[in-house]
């Protein structure tokens, strides 16, 4: 599906829910992904401190020499890795337009393959 179409639907739902009370806000799950590059950043050193549900920060890196759509995933200021290249275009498009995105850890698995250790969810609120 075209990333722009996904974002149009998400933004339409947000506008429709703009008049709801704070406790009735709509939170739309737009992506659930594995964390890319976990073994190359601070993830291994922080593994024991990470918890399912912990908030994550998504930080665009438009000048990244390897991927113009790069989005770093940070936990408490530490870079854990990236949104996978194959899944970052729609999120980059949204972040570049100021869409309020929230992310959190959705799963932690002690797997020998670091690419399978952390999954995260991204929401539009």
Question: Across the structure, where does each feature detected by a protein language model lie?
Answer:
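Conserved active-site motif detector
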Residues: 2-125
């Amino acid at each position: 599906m075209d990333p722009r179409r996904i974002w149009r639907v998400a933004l339409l739902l947000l506008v429709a829910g703009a008049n709801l009370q704070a406790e009735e806000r709509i939170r739309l799950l737009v992506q659930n992904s594995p964390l890319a590059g976990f073994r190359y950043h601070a993830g291994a050193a922080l593994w024991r401190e990470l918890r399912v549900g912990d908030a994550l920060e998504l930080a665009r890196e438009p000048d990244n020499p390897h991927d113009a759509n790069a989005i770093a995933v940070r936990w408490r200021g530490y870079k854990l890795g990236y949104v996978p290249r194959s899944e970052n275009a729609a999120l980059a498009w949204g972040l570049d337009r100021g869409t309020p995105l929230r992310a959190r850890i959705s799963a932690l698995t002690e797997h020998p393959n670091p690419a399978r250790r952390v999954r995260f969810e991204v929401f539009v609120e």
